[in-house]
Every structure is written in C-alpha cells, then in structure tokens.
Amino acid sequence: MLRWARAWRVPRGVLGASSPRRLAVPVTFCSSRSSGQENADLRPLPLSYNLLDGDATLPAIVFLHGLFGSKTNFNSLAKAMVQRTGRRVLTVDARNHGDSPHSPDASYEAMSQDLQGLLPQLGLVPCVLVGHSMGGKTAMLLALQRPDVVERLVVVDISPVGTTPGSHIGAFIAAMKAVEIPEKVPHSQARKLADKQLSSVVKEAGIRQFLLTNLVEVGGRFSWRLNLDTLAQHLDKIMTFPQQREPYSGPTLFLLGGNSTYVQPSHHSEIRRLFPQAQIQTVPNAGHWVHSDKPQDFMDAVTSFLA
C-alpha cells in the first residue's frame, strides 16, 4: 500500500489583512527573473522541470499544478506513477511559480506556449497531460491549440467555463505580501515567523504550510518565489478560459471531486462541445484537490484511463 503525504486544502473563508511587525522588513517577491513585457510575441519561457525516466516508447505523463503550487506538489504521485505505469513522468513549474521565470503575462495562451516550447525539446510529443485547476486550464488550451502534442488529456476538477474569482484568492496574496521577517534569521525561524503572522488570517494550518513552500531566502532576505504582483493583477484572467471553437477529439477524462463545486452540471455542455470524447468521473468524498484528498482513487482513475 502506498503511503501518501497529506496535502493542503483551501478554506472557504475569506482572509483579511495581516498586521506589520516591528523591526522587520517586508517579505518581497522575486522579480529579477522577469521576462519582459506582457504578450511580447508569446515567446516561451525556460520552465523549471523534473523528468523521471521510464519507457520511452510510451507517451510520457506530464503533471501541471494549480495556482500557488509547484512541481513539488506531485513528487510522491509522480514516483508512484512511474512505478505503476512504467512511463516517463514530467512535473513542471508554471511561469510565475516555483523555480520558473517570472513574467508580466499570466495568460493561458502564454502558459500553453511555454509547454509548446518545452515538450518537443524534451522529446515528449505526444504526451498525456494531467492538469489540476489552473494547470487543467493550461492543459485544455494546449490540447485545443495543438492536438498533435496531446495523446490524451486528464483535467482535474476544473472546466472550460470561466468563473468569478473567490475573494479568498486575492486575500491569500494580500496576506503573503503583509508578512515581515527580520533579515538574516535561520530559515526554520523565518517559516515560524511567517506562519504566526499568516495564522491570524489563514486559519487552516495546511494552507499555511502550502503557502510557506514558496518562501525562499535570497541574499539574506526572504522572498516569495511566486510573482504575487502579476498573479494579483491577473486573477480575473486566470479564472476565465479563452474562447475556443475547434474541439479536441482525443480521449479526455474530467476527474471531479465529489465535495467540490468548481465544476457545475451546467458546465457539462461546454465540456462535451470542446471535448466530445470526454468521460466525466467523480471521486466520492474528495474536494478540489482530488489527487491529495484521495490519492489512491486518483491513481486508479488515471491508470485505468491510460489502459
């Protein structure tokens, strides 16, 4: 039986602003990796990734994380998937996340273009795309734009229908921006200080620990590796989905959380229009983070779909 680390869950409540602390400096966010102007020819960025080896005769599995996430969210799952399927597995940091470059362009078109640059470079075309939430939208768009790149598609608890951003998402960013940490303190102490400040508004320890995975030390000062300014500015864009006319005719699985409300029955018609071969499957007792709430059920569903 595989052992899985429990991941975080986003609370439904709205976060407030946190209070500044004396004798400390604001935690900045790394901006030295900026790529230039928004929509500058949609040139792909050199994404950070981790590739696990496997059978090169089979299409690789590519995991795309959600908002505020990183490739490390799938570490355990990726290793288990290699063992179970024998395939190569790629995990990727989206632009403005993890160790990938920052850019003022947070559009799905840009994120799709990044993958169109990376996947052929690694010899992973065609591949199986598995995207959660924001990563699911990127995966859908790439499949619609470049069906030759995507052998089959798994979309986790998101749909091609735009939604209004929850106020808690903007509050996550505001809470992180408000954190202040003294210079040149040990990383363990910095995490404790940040956790304490976030705790006044982020009540669930799981979500705090998830956000704190983005806290890094640069030159003796602590920074958020997320591009918080761009993400805050483009939340509306991130919550929408680009209008598309031509469908993706490849095999597609929409894997939904039984306790999640992200994908409504009213979305199914648009799912069927754009993905006519779509299977829609629900994992009971799972929330939005299906792969962390019910990892074994998630693995079973994906591997069955690949069979």
From Swiss-Prot:
EC number(s) recorded for this UniProt protein: 3.1.1.116
Protein name as catalogued: sn-1-specific diacylglycerol lipase ABHD11
Disruption phenotype: Homozygous knockout mice lacking Abhd11 are viable and only a slight but significant reduction in body weight has been noticed in males exclusively. In addition, less abdominal fat deposit is observed. Mice show some eye defects, including iris synechiae, melanophagy in the iris or the ciliary body, cataract (with reduced lens size when advanced) and retinal atrophy. Such ophthalmologic defects lead to blindness in 9-week old male KO mice.
Claim: Hydrolase is one of the keywords in the record: yes
Stated family: Belongs to the AB hydrolase superfamily.
Residue range covered by the transit peptide: 1-34
Residues that bear N6-succinyllysine: 79, 196
Known tissue expression: Expressed in white adipose tissues.
Sorted UniProt keywords: Hydrolase, Mitochondrion, Transit peptide
Post-translational changes noted in the entry: Phosphorylated.
Enzyme class, broadest EC rank: hydrolase
GO CC terms: mitochondrial matrix; mitochondrion; oxoglutarate dehydrogenase complex
Coiled-coil boundaries: none
Active site: 133, 229, 288
Function: Catalyzes the hydrolysis of diacylglycerol in vitro and may function as a key regulator in lipid metabolism, namely by regulating the intracellular levels of diacylglycerol. 1,2-diacyl-sn-glycerols are the preferred substrate over 1,3-diacyl-sn-glycerols. The enzyme hydrolyzes stearate in preference to palmitate from the sn-1 position of 1,2-diacyl-sn-glycerols. Maintains the functional lipoylation of the 2-oxoglutarate dehydrogenase complex (OGDHc) through its interaction with the OGDHc by preventing the formation of lipoyl adducts.
Gene: Abhd11
Tagged with keyword DNA repair: no
Induction statement: Up-regulated by rosiglitazone and down-regulated by high fat feeding.
Catalysed reactions, semicolon-separated: 1-octadecanoyl-2-(5Z,8Z,11Z,14Z-eicosatetraenoyl)-sn-glycerol + H2O = 2-(5Z,8Z,11Z,14Z-eicosatetraenoyl)-glycerol + octadecanoate + H(+); a 1,2-diacyl-sn-glycerol + H2O = a 2-acylglycerol + a fatty acid + H(+); a 1,3-diacyl-sn-glycerol + H2O = a 1-acyl-sn-glycerol + a fatty acid + H(+); 1-octadecanoyl-2-(9Z-octadecenoyl)-sn-glycerol + H2O = 2-(9Z-octadecenoyl)-glycerol + octadecanoate + H(+)
Single GO molecular function: lipase activity
